[in-house]
Amino acid sequence: MDTSLLEAIQRYVQLEEARKPFLLCQLTKMLQFVLANLAPMRRYQIVDLIKGLVRNRVRVKQTEFQQYEILNRLSKALRESASNNYWNGYSAAICLSHDIDYEMGHAFVPNMAEINLDHGVKASFNFLTGWDYEIDHEVVSSLVEQGFEIGLHGHTHDIALGCRRRSRIEKDLRNSLDFITRYAVSGFRAPALSIGDNLLAVLSRLGFTYDSSFSGVDRYTGVVSFCLPFRFTAFGMWEIPLSIQDTYFFRDRNLSDTDALEEAISIMDAIVAMGGVAVINCHPCIVKNHLEFYRGVLSYIAKQNRVWNPCLIDLVLFLKNRSDANVQGHENWGCNTSLQ
């Protein structure tokens, strides 16, 4: 895939992010301040209510994938990569991640890992280091031994993290350095997908290899905008765009397990057909009440013979090797090559 196309995609993403108004960032900061002083369960309920209000007011303008010249080029390149088995000998890739937001989710992590193992599907578990649960290091060590990747979701679940000053972000994330070092963490998912230049700069300075916070699929229509990893040359980091979140189906739209699974498969089918990378994020605190949906997603992934299922870091290491980049020390970054 040519460098000019990847640079064009990067410019497109930056333009899309630049459209977020300044006032929205300030309102988000104020909301985070209020939420930070609430009990965890009350906080969760209020966030749920706010998302419901937004859902009822939003009017979605559907956008076709072919409308943008950049995306036309991307679509063509993706189809070529699919026919050439670009992704480590496979025509497409599907990566699974789990953001651990609350204590109820943290408690369900061992069960979730067991379900993943039953289906032979790899995943990345992203933890908060200073939120409303105390990390069980025996559980995390067990995840590593079983072949899962450990990532960082932040120190606290600061939904305005990407809007804050660089010094504030660095101070916050440095609280997680012991965890980062202990588990050789290389990947990040921003709380509430709150990403920005300041956050990316801090992540790069702290030695992160990739971020997966940009959304590449419309949460209401399922229209795929982009599904290809790209590199931020200014930060020396990779971005693996997020395709699906369980929150889109259950918190934002209140779908049944059956309807949610149907939409998830439709999105994955579209990305696989284009030869792209689908990233599915499922929260343990949500999945525990939607196991029919979750097992359906895992079954779909397990049955895809032409699709690669790496941990996110292993996908990035493949891309770094593919571009002849320097990957010194990669043995310590990746998750195990096979699930036990």
What are these regions (language model features)?
Residues M1-I135, R182, D197-L206, V217, ...:
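Terminal accessory/targeting
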Residues H137-V139, G162-E170, L199-L203:
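Metal-dependent catalytic neighborhoods of phosphoester/phosphodiester hydrolases
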Residues L143-F148, D178-A184, I301-R306:
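Structural recognition of alpha->loop->beta junctions
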Residues G147-H155, G207-V223, R231-T233:
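Acidic, His- and aromatic-enriched active-site or binding-groove loops in soluble protein domains
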Residues D158-C163, F249-R251:
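A short acidic, helix-capping loop that chelates divalent metal ions and anchors anionic groups
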Residues I169-I180:
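An active-site-proximal "capping" alpha-helix that borders the catalytic cofactor pocket
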Residues S186-G196:
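Conserved strand-turn element in the central/C-terminal portion of the radical SAM core barrel
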